[in-house]
Structure formats: C-alpha cells, structure tokens
From Swiss-Prot:
Single biological process term from Gene Ontology: GPI anchor biosynthetic process
Location(s) in or outside the cell: Endoplasmic reticulum membrane
Broad class of enzyme this protein falls into: transferase
GO terms for MF: alpha-1,2-mannosyltransferase activity; mannosyltransferase activity
Main location: endoplasmic reticulum
Function statement: Mannosyltransferase involved in glycosylphosphatidylinositol-anchor biosynthesis. Transfers the third alpha-1,2-mannose to Man2-GlcN-acyl-PI during GPI precursor assembly.
Enzyme Commission number(s): 2.4.1.-
Positions of disulphide bridges: none
Transmembrane segments: 53-73, 81-101, 164-184, 190-210, 234-254, 292-312, 323-343, 348-368, 372-392
Name assigned to this protein: GPI mannosyltransferase 3
Amino acid sequence: MPWWLISLTFIYRLFLCATIRTVEAPDEWWQSTEVAYNMVFGKGHLPWEWRYGLRSVFFPAVVALPFYLLKLLGRDTTWAVWFAPRVLQALVLTLIDVSVFRMGATLDELLAKRELELAEEMRQSKTKGFSYFREVFVSRSRRGICNSISYTALLLSLSNWYMAYCGVRLYGNVIEALLVLLTLQQRRYVPFLLLTGLASAIRVTSAVVLSPLVFRHLANATREHGFTRGLFRIVLTGLIVLVAVLGGVMVLDYCFYGRWVLTPLAFFRFNVLHNLSRFFGEHPWYFYVGPVLVGIVGPHVLFTIAAPLVLWRDTASRAVSRPVLGMLGIGAWTLGFYSLIDHKEMRFVFVVIPLSLITAAFVLVRWSRTSAVVVKMNRLFVLFNIVMIYLMGYVYRRGPLDVMAEVRDGPRINRLDVIATCYTVPGYSYMHRKVNHLGFVDCSIDLDEKTGLPKVTEDIMFRRYPKEYVLWRYDGKHSFNMGDLEESRKASELQSVVMPKSAPHPDAMVMTRAVAKEIEEPFLKRHGYRLYRTFLHSPLTLAPYEDIYIQMWVKVTK
C-alpha cells in the first residue's frame, strides 16, 4: 500500500474520530479513556469490573500513554486530553485498513499467477474453442473497472458504516480486531503466538477465536520436522510464549490492582462459565448469524456469502480457495462461539467485518468482469453506507457528546451531576480541568454472597422512581403515600438502596427532558435551578429510558 494512500486513509480516519458526535455504549469511555485517565491523573470513577479484577489494565495502559506524555510535557489542556485518544484510535483504524489492503493484495497475487498460467495453457493449446472467446470477452469487459481485490477491499473498509461508527470508539474490540488481522497474516509460529497473546490480554475470548489456526501451524511443523519433533516444538514454544505473555500481563495488573490477579481467567469465568453477563441483556442464539451480520457488514454481505459459489464455478478463483475459505471459516467460528454466550453486543464480533469485506471484494472483482449489474449494486451499497455513516455518526443519539462539548467550551464548573441512567455520559477524560466533581447515578454491581446474583443498584431505583430518587438523594424526603401498602413498599425499597441527602446540590445538572419535567416543580425551581440549554439527542428514541432531548440546568446564585 503506497504511503500517500496510507496518509490519506489516516487523515480520513482521524476526521471521523474527531467529528463523530454520537454514542453507542458506555464501554467506549468507561473501559478505556476513563480508566486511563484515572491511571495518569488519579481522578475519576472506575466501573465495578475493576473491583472484581475482571479486566486487564493492558488496554487502558495503551490509552494512557498519550495522557502520560501530555502530563509530562505540561501540555494536558482540556482539548489535548480529549483529542489525544482520537489520534490513537485513528492510527488503529488505519492499521486495520492497511491489513485489509495487504490481505486483499495477497489474493490479487495468487489470482494473477493463476491467470497467467491459464493464459499460457491457452496459448499452447491447438484448439482454443469456446474458452478462448470467453477469455477474450472477459479481458475486454475488464476495461474501465477496478479489478484489484486490495483496492476494492480498502474501498469497502473505508465506506462500511459500522467500521466508521464503531471503529472510532475506544473499544478493546477494535484493537483486538487489528491484532487478529495481524495474526492471520503470520506464517511463523512465534509471531503468531505473541500476537495471539496480546489479543487475548485485551479480550481473553480472542484465544478461542484464533485457536483453529494452531492446527495450521501444527500441520506445518509436523510436515517440516516430523510428527513427534513438530508437536514437541509447537507445545514447547507455546508454553514459553504463554508464560511470557501471561507473566507480563500479571505483573502489569499487579501494579494496578495491588494484588496478584489472573484477569483473563476471572473474565472468562464470570462472562462465559458462570454466564453472569446475561444480566446485562440476553439475545437468542441466532442474533449474530442473522440481524447482526447483515447489520454490521451491510448489504455487501450478499457478496460475502456468495464466495463459495464463485470458488466452485470460477476455475481461476480456486487459486485463492484456501485463504478465502479460511477467512470465511474464522468468521463462522467467531460467530458460532459468541452465539453460545447469552449476552450479545454487535461490537463483540467486530473482527468479522474486515474478513467479510475482503471476501466480498473478491466476489465483486470476479463478478464485475462480466456483470454491469454487480457494479451498479456495489455503487448503490457504498452510497447506502455513506448515508448510514451520516445518520448513525452525526444524528442518532448525539446528546451526551454535545453536552460534553458544551462543558469543554464553557466556564469551569465546581460540581456537575448527571441524573440519567447508568454511564450515560463520559467522565473527566472528556472535560479535563473543567469540572471539579462529577456525580452520577451509581450502578456499581455488588454480587450477593449467598445467591451470587447482582444486588439492586441506585440505577434501578432511578429507573423505577426518578422523581422520588432525586428528592430522596438530595433532600432526604419523598412523596410516597405511606398509608398505601404498595406505596410504602416502594418507599422502603428506595430507602434500602439510596442514602438520604447523600449528595449536595450541584451547580449544574444534566438529565433527559422527561425527568426534568417530572422534577421541575418539586426540586429544580424550588432550589433555584434554571434551564441553561436543551440538546437534541435523537430524532427518535429506540432505547428504553431515553428521550429526544437532553437538558442542562444550572443553579442561579443570588
């Protein structure tokens, strides 16, 4: 991939990372930039997973590097602390694009070699027949269209809506996808193991995703050194790399947690073996293989699933059957494995996108030679993705980041409370030095020692009784009718979870318009708050407990 194209790709990815204003899930802040901010600046809230040692500090430590550099140089301004992770994420996305291009280029080389062989066979043939005229027609129809898998795959990667929408966010899933792509390109066993170890340090499930590739390296080793020696080399090298990577991760986690903890095992036990992640939402087994695959790959998935047909009918294409079927196999294995876990999110299978797009590019190049309809379909699909990037990246659910932009550009606030559902907005990493104290509805999970199930949280109480929660938290009173048995039960439930007057009245409050209407008379106006600004969150709301508008209220000082 030429350097000028890499530079343009990075500029495009940086533009997306810096301008996209919508939100997807709280983990894009609270498992990355907020943890990194806490590591460097010693301030902020850590989600409950970090209390139980479920996550390795490896990924947040990578994010913390630009924070530490800014702090060391004394350049940690509000804007710089916000912008630095965007540069890092743009670099990760660009490397994914480069990997997509390189893997596509490998297919190009194999196809070009095979086509040269076929052309030579035809020239040497005395009776050319129908195949000769077909080859002439194909060569002519290739004029004026892109017949490069690498460039087509890059185009699909740059235009894919979910790659732009999710890839700009600092999820561990995105850098995991990069490491998986790099791993797939390794022919030597040691680099393969090292990259697999790094991917597993970020998300332990990567080890399961990449496990089928071990058999490929085992086959190569036994072919080169014999079965016994080859197996011995594979096992011994694997153990050495495993101890090195796992030991390094444990030392890094010890520095953060202050105790020895095997985070991959804790994560795997909690989310996979005990399946406790199901309390954050459950989906049917076909969720990934049905709506998610179609959703994240987009309409180009039609070309992806057509790859076996192309390999079967096109003689020249069989030269790339192993890598193409390998990518399809890894994608299917990934979807199948994650389908066994009840808690499912689209970003968990982010790595499937580049693999699917490379395969789709292969089909596009082969079919576009003889079909103008395929070329038009591709253009239409790319246009669809561009529209989706705009809607999902700049329109749908943009309220929280608009609030953060307002805080970054506004005067310093002593105390800002976000009265909304769990982790609706980012923390200090998005408003460095602009807010002295950030308060929010606590949703830290505490497991019951007897049942092993999560206890009721403040967030649950807020969802059930938003007005009463605010009155009880700040004023130590509620409006439940204690003479009514059901109302009395609700009051007791609230009092058992939320401490009365547990927070002072903040200088500013952020909440949905629906909550503001409910507490405007009994709380906001009573304590001298006025509406500062209303932010459009989304033209329509599909998620529960959301609203079309988010409002900021400020306390008027007399």
